[in-house]
Design a protein with these regions (language model features):
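Conserved functional hotspots at enzyme active or ligand-binding sites that engage polyanionic ligands
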Residues: 1-115
Length: 115
């Protein structure tokens, strides 16, 4: 499967205590399509009252929602990053369009201290 930055995929994402994992959506944030491993950020349908500065809320009303392939309103948690083998990706759901990618980049920059 050819993967690019901005692809929204399903992956087994580990719990923070590493006791187990659950198949969840994530967005690819790494840029090298030839790499064996990809860096992903966690996506959750458990919505915060107020999103953190490192989170982006995407709702079904948003013009970018359909292309994402997500089924529910979701929060992109750009501070929850993980490098995984691309072979662990279950399937691609959709892709962040340019507008959504720009929003995610702002949150990612804040998450890693570049903004």
């Amino acid at each position: 499967m050819d993967l690019v930055r901005g692809d929204i995929v399903l992956v087994p994402f580990p719990f923070t205590d590493l006791t187990s994992s659950k198949v969840r959506p994530a967005v690819i944030v790494s840029a090298d399509p030839q790499a064996v491993d990809v860096t992903i950020a966690f996506i959750s349908s458990v919505l915060p009252g107020i999103p953190a500065k490192t989170e982006f809320l995407l709702t079904a009303k948003d013009k970018n929602f359909a292309a994402s392939g997500l089924k529910k309103d979701s929060v992109f948690k750009m501070s929850k990053l993980l490098a995984i083998s691309s072979s662990l990706i279950v399937r691609r759901l959709g892709r962040a369009n340019a507008s959504l990618q720009k929003e995610l980049d702002v949150c990612l920059a804040k998450a890693v201290g570049l903004a």
